[in-house]
A protein has these predicted regions:
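Rossmann-like dinucleotide-binding core of oxidoreductases
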Residues: 1-92
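Generic structural signal for well-ordered, non-membrane alpha-helical segments
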Residues: 18, 22-26, 87-95, 120, ...
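Amphipathic alpha-helical segments that form well-ordered structural scaffolds
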Residues: 24, 28-32, 93-101, 162, ...
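Short flexible/disordered coil segments
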Residues: 44-63, 105-110, 116-122, 167
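Short, flexible active-site loops
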Residues: 73-85, 112-113, 140-148
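Small-residue-rich helix-loop
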Residues: 84-87, 94-136
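Long, low-complexity C-terminal extensions of enzymes
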Residues: 114-167
Length: 167
């Protein structure tokens, strides 16, 4: 097998469980990945995960596009499923809620725009612009089967549901 690395992140936060082991984890990982920074705890790394913003809303709100992809049309996830104004608006609402939850728990919280600027050096005035102008995301194909998709089967129960519970 082969792995294709499109881009190394400029910065990535990590934490250990339990958090008292953060220093040991950092001392080990920084040797192979010097861009890492210590987060307070895994709650901080979880709340700053952009997956629940990036994946469920575009997937669920664009099932007809996914059906076209399943039929063989060459479609791209970030280019064709992240649309304006509705999908972008829903994504922004999820991001706002995620940030509010993080602040309520006194965590160092980033918006998705902050995360993309820090992680990839990609900037823009809106989520739509950041996703459409991120050169590292251009090649990601649209999914072909919504029922076998990590974007739903993982992100919803393991990211959105906990966020809703904390909310």
């Amino acid at each position: 097998g082969a792995v294709e690395i499109l881009k190394e992140k400029n910065k990535m936060r990590v934490a250990a469980l339990p958090a008292k082991d953060n220093r040991h984890v950092m001392d080990t990982l920084v040797q192979v990945y010097p861009q890492i920074e210590a987060a307070q705890n895994v709650m901080e790394t979880s709340i700053n995960n952009v997956g629940p913003v990036n994946h469920p809303a575009p997937t669920l709100l664009n099932t007809s596009i996914i059906e076209r992809s399943a039929a063989g049309e060459d479609l791209r996830f970030y280019r064709d499923l992240i649309t304006r104004p509705i999908v972008e608006m829903v994504m922004e609402k999820i991001d706002d809620e995620k940030v509010s939850i993080g602040k309520a728990f006194d965590l160092d919280t980033w918006t998705c725009l902050d995360w993309y600027r820090e992680s990839y050096g990609v900037t823009g005035p809106s989520l739509y612009d950041v996703y459409h102008n991120n050169p590292y995301y251009l090649g990601f194909h649209a999914p072909t089967d919504i029922l076998q998709l990590n974007n739903i089967l993982d992100e919803v129960p393991n990211s959105l549901v906990p966020l809703a519970s904390f909310s």
